């Protein structure tokens, strides 16, 4: 295609050009050169055009140079490849070669982008690797530029034409100079000075010829820069091999392992110091000192004889004096898995200074190293090492723990008492007595957290005298909880739950019949809320938390916990689920307390006898059965404080005057049934239907104000007790509150009239 372009772009006389082309090919075969006439005719006018693409333009420092041109070509090809990845394309151009020089013309617009005369072109470089690329350097002094061009066809014809162009120009000038020389020779006799000028001109011509020989050069660049980093990778590999050689020579010299050129940690195998692990360890030694044992890197040496790790190089002199045994002992038998694992242990130690203080604040002080290493180990690794504490004493029996009061790098104060009492504490920790169960460990954990929170010294070891023989912490250990205590501690209190004072939270008991019951419900109205019962037991669960005791502000709910459970006949047919509030939602009538729980489910140990008698004397009819709840509540406080009815609801007060007139008339009617009189039935019905709903709803809602008022105020009587029936007289409130729970065997509520007479207290009613 270039040949077609050449013939079409030459100025006229194609017949004349065709004639010399044939002999030129023959002459090329013969090795003869092209004639000047042919070259002049070829580059005359517009010259020759070649279709190409402009790779790029780069500024270069020198006018010529193969290496410079190669570097510039590589740079421009890389930039072109980057632009191609972004969708950019090279500029399509025409390269015009003529006697005037080189012209770069835009293919689309035909505008001459660049024009360089022959005398401005200082160097032309061809690419021996990429046969479709070449470049040339042009510009004045200090303004040299390298133009990289990629031709559509082979670049060799274009470079040959450039050579021919320079050659023909040189020949033309030479001929002109010869003509001038002949003319000057004819005139030389006239002026001898002209002979000197002729010599100077000849010297310049020779110099021009020499420059023409240095005009062209060769460069080598890859044809395609799809992988431009190939040569760089080779250089990096060579450099890496050189580094390996240097490091091997350093590694073989044992006297250079002083903490600067190699890691100061004992290693199972030699490693190059430029690795990340050893480089990090070398950075730890900010003040390296010569190693007294240059052969300690021997992988076959015993780990006990290894030098101190680099972690101790960070330790100050005071800390080293404080713990003299830590530097002379092996650091957890050396790094078992190499430097990486040992660095992981060091980082664990740093993190455990703040993250794992629970073990430090525990009830056990730090024991001696022998028992600790011999017993408290897991998988051959000591417990302190697993927790990140590498400050272990030597297993040598002659090496003791550090002196008392001296600080350790972790800030732990190891008292002399801990080393003396170490064997006892270890025996307790490993073989705890039977009393030390999971609750005991829970208390120990609470104690340790307490020390972490409020102790002056988090890491201070606990004196042995404060430890109980059973392995549980003594009572004075929880003294910080006394800040919140407002009442005496419970006799069977456990932990900070009892020390909370007036907060009526029932601690869990180990007995099988006392589940946890939330007592604020009982403090509101002791008789209204019934403790939950498990289905497997026949006795009521109120024995664990007696509401009557809580009402009188006793700090512990275990005052009557030792009382024996009632017979199994007292087990109601309708049992409430454990730890549940009394709810009326699943019942048909929300005001029937008998549907919530039968009177037999109420603990007779928790309430006085008047309350229990009033519960048992309720009539069998469903409407009157609503009364036992309110009567139980009112009778309990009426017998204790007759004047305590100041805060009774208005609904109660509506019928208070009518109900208070009948109790004095009832004492002689103990044998009568409550259903015999219409007035008592009316009174009980009216009392249960009108007086209870408001109070019962209040108990279901658990008003916070009512809870606080009921806890702090004295007991109040409920004067409505006599309206139920003639048998429910005022003396019912004075019966023995404990006689019913121990002696009654009434299995049902139907026979309540007879059972109430049989179990009445022989004592009279002093308030009747």
UniProtKB/Swiss-Prot annotation:
The keyword Phosphoprotein applies. Its main location: cytoplasm. A motif (DPF 1) lies at residues 293-295. Phosphorylated. Phosphorylation during mitosis is leading to membrane displacement. There is some ambiguity for the mitotic phosphosite Ser-326/328. GO terms for biological process: cell morphogenesis; cellular response to epidermal growth factor stimulus; cellular response to transforming growth factor beta stimulus; clathrin coat assembly; extrinsic apoptotic signaling pathway; hematopoietic stem cell proliferation; in utero embryonic development; leading edge cell differentiation. GO terms for cellular component: apical plasma membrane; clathrin coat of coated pit; clathrin-coated pit; clathrin-coated vesicle; clathrin-coated vesicle membrane; cytoplasm; fibrillar center; intracellular membrane-bounded organelle. Changing residue 393 to A: Reduces phosphorylation, reduces mitotic membrane displacement. This is Disabled homolog 2. The lineage of its organism: Eukaryota, Metazoa, Chordata, Craniata, Vertebrata.
